[in-house]
A protein has these predicted regions:
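Polybasic "coupling" helices that flank or enter modular domains
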Residues: 108-175
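Cyclic nucleotide-binding regulatory module and flanking cytosolic helices
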Residues: 1-35, 68, 73-76
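Conserved hydrophobic "DFG−1" position in protein kinase catalytic cores
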Residues: 22-23, 40, 50, 86, ...
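Glycine- and acidic-residue-biased ligand/ion/polar-headgroup-sensing regions
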Residues: 35-49, 64-67
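Cyclic-nucleotide recognition modules
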Residues: 61-122, 126
Length: 217
């Protein structure tokens, strides 16, 4: 989750203890550069992708500016071959020291890093739970709610998601073909779950209770 408080001050303090890694759109970050316990997206948008069955690609995390990317030693559990790919030109700040050392030298920044890492782990666990849903439309609406909870804006109609992800990117996140996503979005709109306007999606309900998203947002 995008950790609140990713201010210019935090950015400058992170640069003092991190190695900056620039990644061009469409490229993968070299594994040799991702050697710290955690990295932070300081610019652009990146995803963590793995190769799935039948030559498909699966996105297991989508990250934007301020998001933390926990880098487990030996790779991502259950996701062999995972790589960090830039959806746009991006910059990562890879922590080049132990978390404990940061807590000792800058307790405030260390606490911020720990919160950001906890949010990242919680978001990953939610993504895993969504992936286990058997029905495509259910997986899709849960994923849209997850994205809207992180990046959406409350409007009178619901929570507006202006993330500008493509149908292919949504499909990669929940294990579905692009064509299936297009059909599922249409069905969700017919059911009143969402409103689709070009590449903007408005999520009418952020949970399974009756009423629009603005009732609880």
């Amino acid at each position: 989750m995008n950790e609140q408080g990713f201010t210019d001050d935090v950015y400058e303090r992170l640069r003092g203890i991190c190695t900056a890694v620039a990644v061009l759109a469409g490229d993968a970050a070299p594994e040799s550069t991702l050697t710290g316990p955690v990295a932070f997206v300081s610019a652009g948008r990146v995803s963590v992708v793995v190769d799935a069955e039948a030559g498909r690609r699966r996105t297991i995390a989508l990250l934007q500016e301020g998001d933390a990317l926990v880098l487990p030693a030996g790779g991502w559990p259950g996701a062999p071959g995972a790589r960090v790919r830039a959806a746009t030109d991006a910059e990562l700040l890879v922590l080049n020291r132990e978390i404990g050392d940061v807590l000792c030298s800058d307790a405030g920044l260390g606490a911020w890093i720990v919160r950001a890492m906890a949010s990242a782990v919680a978001d990953r666990e939610l993504s895993v739970a969504i992936a286990l849903e058997p029905r495509l439309e259910r997986r899709l609406v849960l994923k849209l709610r997850q994205l809207a909870d992180r990046w959406g804006k409350v409007t009178p109609e619901g929570v507006r998601l202006d993330l500008r992800v493509t149908h292919q990117e949504l499909g990669d996140m929940i294990g579905a073909a692009r064509e299936s996503i297009t059909v599922a979005l249409g069905r969700l709109q017919d059911q009143g779950e969402i409103i689709v306007r070009r590449r903007t999606v408005i999520i009418r309900r952020m949970d399974d209770q009756d009423g629009t998203a603005t009732d609880t947002a």
